[in-house]
From Swiss-Prot:
<dbReference type="Pfam" id="PF21463">
    <property type="entry name" value="Cry1Ac_dom-VII"/>
</dbReference>
<dbReference type="InterPro" id="IPR054544">
    <property type="entry name" value="Pest_crys_Cry1Aa_dom-IV"/>
</dbReference>
<dbReference type="InterPro" id="IPR005639">
    <property type="entry name" value="Pest_crys_dom_I"/>
</dbReference>
<dbReference type="InterPro" id="IPR036399">
    <property type="entry name" value="Pest_cryst_cen_dom_sf"/>
</dbReference>
<dbReference type="Pfam" id="PF03944">
    <property type="entry name" value="Endotoxin_C"/>
</dbReference>
<dbReference type="Pfam" id="PF00555">
    <property type="entry name" value="Endotoxin_M"/>
</dbReference>
<dbReference type="InterPro" id="IPR001178">
    <property type="entry name" value="Pest_cryst_dom_II"/>
</dbReference>
<keyword id="KW-0800">Toxin</keyword>
<dbReference type="GO" id="GO:0001907">
    <property type="term" value="P:symbiont-mediated killing of host cell"/>
</dbReference>
<keyword id="KW-0843">Virulence</keyword>
<comment type="function">
    <text>Promotes colloidosmotic lysis by binding to the midgut epithelial cells of many lepidopteran larvae.</text>
</comment>
<dbReference type="InterPro" id="IPR008979">
    <property type="entry name" value="Galactose-bd-like_sf"/>
</dbReference>
<dbReference type="InterPro" id="IPR005638">
    <property type="entry name" value="Pest_crys_dom-III"/>
</dbReference>
<protein>
    <recommendedName>
        <fullName>Pesticidal crystal protein Cry1Ja</fullName>
    </recommendedName>
</protein>
<dbReference type="InterPro" id="IPR036716">
    <property type="entry name" value="Pest_crys_N_sf"/>
</dbReference>
<dbReference type="InterPro" id="IPR038979">
    <property type="entry name" value="Pest_crys"/>
</dbReference>
<dbReference type="Pfam" id="PF18449">
    <property type="entry name" value="Endotoxin_C2"/>
</dbReference>
Length: 1167
């Protein structure tokens, strides 16, 4: 039975896609194809990435002046059709309307830019271009959320990336030309910082949205795989390829023409899928198709392919192939791939060899043998391979049997339709695999050239997958989506790869190398050329282990030392060292021309300008007020980095001027030891601080010492650093300023205290280095910081002054805080306290170049305000003194009442723990014992407070000494107690109490006593529910007594004055109890319950009294705190006991309900 081949070979896509029709081999498409528009834009960005009117006009011509609303709608429809999701009408209309509005506004901006470009000194033209920039910038910032509406992120993605690209291009214009337009330096720097943030934000959104949808689509069936692969291919062309170029908008990193390359591969569907009906076959699994897609690899180029032929019922088809390829910079068959498919012999093999720029187009003839004919065969029965050749038309081709009608240009259109396809094509064939006998074609973008050519007039970006030799330990892994291709990875020290490069310029030309990388560790990179070492330097960690590879985790860093090539064709090698068991990823290598002479001249001019800007006049008699100590250090770095060869005399002169500036800065600084030579070394001067602060030597940020303040686990014990400015250094009625440089900080609190506290919480996000992403973490020959690489310069416009009383989020790392001084009094010596404090676990800070200096005399309103504040402070001080006299008298009486006499070495007989806490509470009512802002700094009442606190400490010690029962207040959990059954220690009204919840539970302690002596057993407890709670004291033979507690009758509260006077020396040698002593004779009946809920607390809870200052509950925390009175229901009972042996047992239990014990005391009677 004959097959009707004419009907059988109708391509599937001709029937399923009404927008594409093949007539006699020609494609008829809509007016605008989103793929063609995106590829055309991509070609423009790759070849014309130079800012200015030409670039702006190109964007207008390619996108923003060319697309009508109906054509923007095709961008949305493209993805809608792929993922079978319709955008809501309102969302669609809003997106298209806003895209149209952006296009109109961009055209107006383009007109304004061209006007200014033709007359750059015209003030009206400057004003117009600034206005149009700000309008358009605001519109994009306002409208771009409309292109990522939740639920529609995927179908909106291709227009989102167009809006993002427009925005980054606009921001780049303002960064490059903004100051010439009239924008301030601060404004330009703010825009630049925002641009860098949005490069990462836009990139991450596109990649995350793409990956999420790709994972959702899946590829288990062949129908799913076709959609999956088409989505992958088309969004690579319309979204990811454009995203890969976003970093090039960083004009400070790429100030000149930059050439990028896209090394990713895209795949067209197996030829058999274009056959009608086959797509619905359930016999082909999508997973098997995906397995034929190449895994990550070093980039190679198609060299040749041998095609084998088999037949089925006299119909010939392509059944197998063998391929060869070559690496970048080489030619010929360097790599041979194994046979794919079968080596059929129905016809002689056909060899297809690459010509010139490779195969740009394939016309395939699908083949299908139906099941009723026997064996099912899906494949191709004919192919035509067209080669790209710019100077020959029509281009050469190779035909396998006969051409087909399935055109690869339908799936991967040309990038330039103004020329014939062989000249305007966007991709070349890179590899062929097969699923069964159905060929699968892999394609690479033409920007990835077959050689790594270095241009002396441009920045050349070369992905490291274009290497020809991968070293052991290095692997090629799938790119994260925003790199334009796959990347290399190492987890230990070694070489990544060798790359062949071709030099087109003179060999005298010098270059600097940069690396775009991501790393979980600090490390060293090294480079070699033809085996000779060229560069080595330290580079910083960019991410934490386990983090996803996001845009912000990649850094472009370079070596400061330029080099030149000795051969026109050379081998470049990159490796890493000084790390292990971490992850390092390499995206690309960049070769940047180094213009040495120009740099030296520019550096000298910049240094001269910076030095002169330090002084008030040309004779260098005084520093400008706004010149900071940090700025002087940075200017010093500029001078030190000048070339000795080019400008040695000028360098020496400038160095002397900077040293003079530094001496003037030191002279006006009222801080002692501003360079942090020591902390806590001198008791009455210099810096005082917590022991966890570290002083570190200069780094790439600080030229001199700086301090690091870590976080703390308890806000009552903060990390702190402080110093007092003596009254003798201050002038009356003058404003003073504290300022400095913060490398990074979180929750850093800064205080200036005189009459009251000036307070700011400063958060400065750190970059990890002052040096931009374009350089490595610099080191010199001896390991010192190499401050001569390009870095972020100090700019006074970026200074952030915290004077508004609000939390200050600095745009720069400079901070300042001022305070006004009224009348000065050397006797009172009020001075000014300078305090830095961190009281959170996540807090931290690194700061240096601190200054406290006179700012200006107070006049007018400021003078009146400080006089009013001073009077208010003195009135409060008088009131405080009056209150203190009263509170001190009451507290002193309470403390004295605890003791027998003024020797304070014996407690009164009736003194109990509650009385001591009550006295301690009265002592804590004394205000201003310490500064509320930092409780280690003594206040005006520190002397009397510490006097009474010392007596309270003595009282606690005497009380603990006379109670023979260890841990009788359960503040140390169940330590020293034996437990049987389940009991618990709970916090009840800030007290640690023993809870016995079950009648079978018991708690006991063995106690050593002196036989024949008398003891008082005193228990404070509370009974809940029915039954009785019992505390029993007994000896091994007999002599048992007990205290019972019940909730069924009104209990009498026993006084605590039973017994004689108790001394501080009860329990003499031989009668003292050892806590680790256990019950003898009862050890089988009791066991230590290691699973009981034990909460080891400090001896006394730390709480803020309600009647002291409430702005700091840790203000008077000196180890003792509030102990609240006994809650209602607690009863204190006691009994007298006379032991006959040297050991007694205290047992606690109950008969029913719950028994709660606050404390158990066993006190020796006085003889």
């Amino acid at each position: 039975m004959e097959i009707n081949n004419q009907k059988q070979c109708i391509p599937y896509n001709c029937l399923s896609n009404p927008e594409e029709v093949l007539l006699d081999g020609e494609r008829i498409l809509p007016d605008i194809d989103p793929l063609e528009v995106s590829l055309s834009l991509l070609q423009f960005l790759l070849n014309n990435f130079v800012p200015g009117g030409g670039f702006i006009s190109g964007l207008v011509d390619k996108i923003w002046g060319a697309l009508r609303p109906s054509e923007w709608d095709l961008f949305l429809a493209q993805i809608e059709r792929l993922i079978d999701q319709r955008i809501e009408a309102t969302v669609r209309a809003k997106a298209i309307t806003e895209l149209e509005g952006l296009g109109r506004n961009y055209q107006i901006y383009a007109e304004a830019f061209k006007e200014w470009e033709s007359d750059p000194d015209n003030e009206a033209a400057k004003s117009r271009v600034i206005d149009r920039f700000r309008i358009l910038d605001g519109l994009i910032e306002a409208n771009i959320p409309s292109f990522r509406i939740i639920g529609f992120e995927v179908p909106l993605l291709s227009v989102y990336v167009q809006a993002a690209n427009l925005h980054l291009a606009l921001l780049r214009d303002s960064v490059i030309f903004g100051e010439r337009w009239g924008l301030t330096t601060k404004n330009v720097n703010d825009i630049y910082n925002r641009q860098i943030r949005e490069i990462h934000e836009y990139s991450n959104h596109c990649v995350d949205t793409y990956n999420t949808e790709l994972e959702r689509l899946g590829f288990r069936s062949i129908a799913q795989w076709r959609i999956y692969n088409q989505f992958r291919r088309e969004l690579t062309l319309t979204v990811l390829d454009i995203v890969a170029l976003f970093p090039n908008y960083d004009s400070r990193l790429y100030p000149i023409q930059t050439f990028s390359q896209l090394t990713r591969e895209i795949v067209t569907s197996p030829v058999s899928e274009f056959y009608y009906g086959v797509i619905n076959s359930g016999n082909i699994i999508g997973t098997l198709t995906e397995q034929q897609i190449r895994r990550p690899h070093l980039m190679d180029f198609f060299n040749s392919m041998i095609m084998y032929t088999s037949d089925n019922r006299r119909e010939h088809y392509w059944s197998g192939l063998e391929m060869t390829a070559y690496f970048t910079g080489f030619a010929g068959a360097q790599v041979s791939f194994p046979l794919v498919g079968t080596r059929g012999e129905s016809a002689p093999p056909l060899t297809v060899r690459s010509v010139n720029d490779g195969i740009y187009r394939i016309l395939s003839a699908p083949f299908y043998s139906a099941p009723f004919l026997g064996t099912i065969v899906l494949g191709s029965r004919g192919e035509k391979f067209d080669f790209a050749l710019n100077n020959i038309s029509p281009p050469p081709s190779t035909i396998y049997r006969h051409p087909g009608t399935v055109d690869s240009l339908v799936s991967i259109p040309p990038q330039d339709n103004s020329v014939p396809p062989h000249r305007g094509s966007s991709h070349r064939l890179s590899h062929v695999t097969m699923r069964a006998s159905s060929p699968i074609f892999h394609w690479t973008h033409r920007s990835a050239t077959t050689t790594n050519t270095i241009n002396p007039n441009a920045i050349i970006q070369i992905p490291l997958v274009k290497a020809f030799n991968l070293h052991s330990g290095a692997t090629v892994v799938r790119g994260p989506g925003f790199t334009g291709g796959d990347i290399l990875r190492r987890t230990n020290t070694g070489t990544f790869a060798d790359m062949r490069v071709n030099i087109t310029g003179p060999l005298s030309q010098r270059y600097r190398v940069r690396i775009r990388y991501a790393s979980t560790t600090d490390l060293q990179f090294f480079t070699r050329i033809n085996g000779t070492s060229v560069n080595q330097g330290n580079f910083q960690r960019t991410m934490n282990r386990g983090d996803n590879l996001e845009s912000g985790n990649f850094r472009t860093a370079g070596f400061s030392t330029p080099f030149s090539f000795s051969n026109a064709q050379s081998t470049f090698t990159l490796g890493t060292q000084a790390f292990s068991n971490q992850e390092v990823y390499i995206d690309r290598i960049e070769f940047v021309p180094a213009e040495v002479t120009f740099e030296a001249e520019s550096d000298l001019e910049r240094a001269q300008k910076a030095v002169n800007a330090l002084f008030t006049s040309t004779n260098q008699l005084g520093l400008k007020t706004d010149v900071t100590d940090y700025q002087i250090d940075q200017v010093s770095n500029l001078v030190e980095c000048l070339s000795d060869e080019f400008c040695l005399d000028e360098k020496r002169e400038l160095s002397e001027k900077v040293k003079h500036a530094k001496r003037l800065s030191d002279k006006r600084n009222l801080l002692q030891d501003p360079n942090f030579t020591s902390i806590n070394r001198q008791l009455d001067r210099g810096w005082r601080g917590s022991t966890d602060i570290t002083i570190q030597g200069g780094n790439d940020v600080f030229k001199e010492n700086y301090v690091t303040l870590p976080g703390t686990f308890d806000e009552c014990y903060p990390t702190y650093l402080y110093q007092k400015i003596d009254e003798s250094k201050l002038k009356a009625y003058t404003r003073y300023e504290l300022r400095g440089y913060i490398e990074d900080s979180q929750d850093l609190e800064v205080y200036l205290i005189r009459y009251n506290a000036k307070h700011e919480t400063v958060n400065v996000p750190g970059t990890g280095s002052l040096w931009p992403l374009s350089v490595e973490s610099p080191i010199g020959r001896c390991g010192e910081p190499n401050r001569c690489v390009p870095h972020i310069e100090w700019n006074p416009d970026l200074d952030c002054s915290c004077r508004d009383g609000e939390k200050c989020a600095h745009h720069s790392h400079h901070f300042s805080l001022d305070i006004d001084v009224g009348c000065t009094d050397l006797n009172e010596d009020l001075g000014v306290w300078v305090i830095f404090k961190i009281k959170t676990q996540d807090g931290h800070a690194r700061l240096g170049n601190l200054e406290f200096l006179e700012e200006k005399p107070l006049l007018g309103e400021a003078l009146a305000r400080v006089k009013r504040a001073e009077k208010k402070w003195r009135d409060k001080r008088e009131q405080l003194q009056f209150e203190t006299n009263i509170v001190y008298k009451e507290a002193k009486e309470s403390v004295d009442a605890l003791f027998v006499d003024s020797h304070y070495n014996r407690l009164q007989a009736d003194t109990n723990i509650t009385m001591i806490h009550a006295a301690d509470k009265r002592v804590h009512r004394i205000r201003e014992a310490y500064l509320p802002e930092l409780s280690v700094i003594p206040g005006v009442n520190a002397d009397i407070f510490e006097e009474l606190e010392g007596l309270i400490f003595t009282a606690f010690s005497l009380y603990d000494a006379r109670n023979i029962i260890k841990n009788g207040d359960f503040n140390n959990g169940l330590s020293c107690w034996n437990v049987k059954g389940h009991v618990d220690i709970q916090q009840n009204d800030h007290r640690s109490v023993l809870v016995v919840p079950e009648w079978e539970s018991e708690v006991s302690q063995e106690v050593r006593v002196c036989p024949g002596r008398g003891y008082i057993l005193r228990v404070t407890a509370y009974k809940e529910g029915y039954g009785e709670g019992c505390v029993t004291i007994h000896e091994i033979e007999d002599n048992t007594d007990e205290l019972k507690f019940s909730n069924c009758i009104e209990e009498e509260v026993y006084p605590t004055d039973t017994g004689n006077d108790y001394t501080a020396h009860q329990g003499t040698t031989g009668c003292a109890d050892a806590c680790n002593s256990r019950n003898v004779g009862y050890e089988d009946g009791y066991e230590i319950n290691t699973t009981a809920s034990v909460n080891y607390k400090p001896t006394y809870e730390e709480e803020m009294y309600t009647d002291v200052r409430r702005d700091n509950h840790c203000e008077y925390d000196r180890g003792y705190g509030n102990h609240t009175p006994l809650p209602a229901g607690y009863v204190t009972k006691e009994l007298e006991y006379f032991p006959e042996t040297d050991t007694v047992w205290i047992e606690i239990g109950e008969t029913e309900g719950t028994f709660i014990v606050d404390s158990v005391e066993l006190l020796l009677m006085e003889e």
